Every structure is written in structure tokens, then in C-alpha cells.
A protein has these predicted regions:
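Glycine-rich flexible loops
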Residues: 1-158
């Protein structure tokens, strides 16, 4: 997904981030690759509905382009503790670093989305498409105008 976003010019430099709530069977299939020696860190938000969940998360300050080239350096798998208040890195970021600085926001959104969709939706993807950023300089910054302009650009939304 990060590579697709890069190929479509959705990211400037290290802009944007991604988190994926990993399915339980996917966690089981890679358990032997995970380490549980990592220090618990505060999430920065309370997300009790996500207790015990695992997430693949882009690293802070990492380029989306590099996710596919060196995933073990540029992203990580984290586990949320049983209180939903802390996380630890179980895999990745082998050259150091932290998960995205947007981690609290991502996890709060995952918690809401999980409840609202009975767990169907698993990805939070934050991008900085240059063409959308450019529109902020030429359009009035109102929801109505901006949304309408974006809809009109899509051929399937006349």
C-alpha cells in the first residue's frame, strides 16, 4: 500500500503514515519472528477495545517509498497491552526509531472504526497528495467548495 501511494505521488518526502490492525491468524503465522523483550511505552491515549491487538505501523520520519525496500528498517509490528494504555515493538525498526508520531490518533481511529464496522476495516492511511495540497492555495477553504471540486474531478462523480 505504501509503495502504491508512492507510485501515485501521494507522498512528499516522509509525509504520511500507515497502520494496519493485523488479523489474529496473521499474527499466529509470524509469532516465531516476534520478540516480546521490548519495553512497554505509553500509547498517549486510552484504547481499551484494542487490548491485545497487533498493528503494523510505519516508522516516524520514514519515507513511504522505503517501506517496500526495507520493511524491517522502516516499519514495525506493535502489540497493545491488556489495558489499552501501552504498546511495545515486537518486530521492525531494526536501526532504531519509533512508530509514527501519529500513533495515538491512529489507534483512537482504529478503536472507533473497529466498533462501528464490527472489525471489518483494518487500515488507517494518512497521505499528503501534492495535488490536494496545491488546491488549498487556489480554492476557498470551505468543506462544501473543496468537497465539490474533488467530486467533480472524479469521472465517476459527475
Amino acid at each position: 500500500m505504501c509503495d502504491d501511494g508512492f507510485d501515485q505521488n501521494w507522498h512528499e518526502r516522509n509525509g504520511g503514515n500507515l497502520s494496519y490492525r493485523i488479523k489474529h491468524e496473521e499474527v499466529e503465522s509470524v509469532k516465531e519472528e516476534l520478540s516480546y523483550d521490548g519495553k512497554w511505552q505509553p500509547v498517549g491515549a486510552s484504547v481499551p477495545a484494542l487490548s491485545g491487538e497487533y498493528f503494523m505501523v510505519s516508522g516516524s520520519g520514514r519515507f513511504m517509498r522505503n517501506m517496500i525496500l526495507e520493511p524491517e528498517t522502516n516499519c514495525c509490528i506493535i502489540e497493545v497491552d491488556q489495558t489499552g494504555e501501552n504498546y511495545r515493538i515486537c518486530w521492525g525498526l531494526v536501526k532504531g526509531g519509533m512508530p509514527t508520531s501519529e500513533l495515538p490518533t491512529h489507534l483512537m481511529n482504529h478503536e472507533v472504526k473497529m466498533k462501528a464496522t464490527e472489525g471489518r476495516y483494518r487500515v488507517i492511511y494518512h497521505a499528503h497528495p501534492a495535488n490536494i495540497i496545491a488546491l488549498t492555495f487556489v480554492l476557498p477553504l470551505t468543506d462544501e467548495v473543496f468537497t465539490r471540486e474533488l467530486w467533480e474531478m472524479a469521472t465517476e462523480c459527475p
